[in-house]
Design a protein with these regions (language model features):
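N-terminal amphipathic/basic leader segments beginning at the initiator methionine
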Residues: 2-42
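Structural motif
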Residues: 37-38, 90-101
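Glycine-rich phosphate/diphosphate-binding loop of Rossmann-like nucleotide-binding domains
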Residues: 51-76, 81
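Short beta-strand elements in bilobed, periplasmic/extracellular small-molecule ligand-binding domains
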Residues: 76-89, 162-170
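Short, well-structured alpha-helical segments in soluble
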Residues: 97-108, 127-130
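Short Gly/Thr/Asp-enriched flexible loops that form oxyanion-binding sites at enzyme active sites
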Residues: 120-132
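Active-site-proximal loop->helix
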Residues: 133, 148-161
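A charged, well-structured terminal subsegment
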Residues: 167-209
Length: 209
């Protein structure tokens, strides 16, 4: 559509806005990083002999089956250590103070697992850090290797990037007892270190940032 523009007469004035009066606020498209509060890990026992280690099932598919193999490893290789498998009293999305209180009262350390999906791996990592930093229980989390970066991000943002963890192959769900035993008795696919060597070191060796 054509526009008709009137030509200003010689004695007319044209008002032009002062560009200096207009201010624009520009925000970074990267956003603002969240504040991270550094947390302190629990003190480690010199020995686990005669002590109780809790194996915490976070109620993901077949997690408890892998923890049974961890319990079997202790019975075979460290019979002086007592173990107890407990399942969360609620779903992994919620904190479980009742279970944590029991572990703090009766346990020397905890092994939490298994993080083997994009939502349960963060859940396992969070529960492990809760036990470490709020209840003073040395804790190692077990995850599958596909979620190592997710776990690293969660622990960093939670203020304990050095939180101890060990990895087993993916998947855990649907595997036989023999296959899960091979996971536990085998090597961490990311580090090449035996899984249970990492676990024992994780609950008995002081953490360093």
């Amino acid at each position: 559509m054509n526009k008709i523009v009137n030509t200003p007469s010689p004695d007319s004035t044209v008002s032009i806005a002062d560009a200096t009066e207009e201010k624009i606020t520009v925000l970074s498209p990267l956003g603002f990083p969240p504040k991270v509060s550094k947390k302190t890990a629990a003190a480690r026992p010199e020995s686990l002999d005669g002590k109780m280690v809790y194996l915490v099932d976070c109620r993901f598919d077949d997690s408890i089956e892998l923890l049974k193999q961890v319990q079997g490893w202790f019975a075979e290789h460290m019979p002086a250590v007592k173990t107890k498998i407990v399942s969360l009293s609620t779903t992994y999305q919620h904190d479980d103070p009742k279970t944590w209180d029991e572990i703090k009262a009766n346990g020397a350390a905890a092994i939490v697992g298994v993080g083997h999906c994009s939502t349960c791996a963060p859940g396992v990592a969070t529960h492990a850090i809760t036990l470490e930093t709020r209840y003073g229980v040395p804790t190692v989390a077990i995850h599958t290797d596909k979620f190592d970066r997710v776990v690293a991000s969660v622990t960093k943002m939670a203020g304990l990037p050095e939180a101890r963890r060990a990895f087993v192959p993916q998947p855990v769900m649907g595997k036989s007892a023999a296959e899960l035993k091979a996971y536990v008795y085998g090597k961490d696919p990311l580090t090449g270190v035996p899984v249970m060597q990492e676990v024992i070191a994780g609950i008995t060796t002081a953490l360093s940032a």
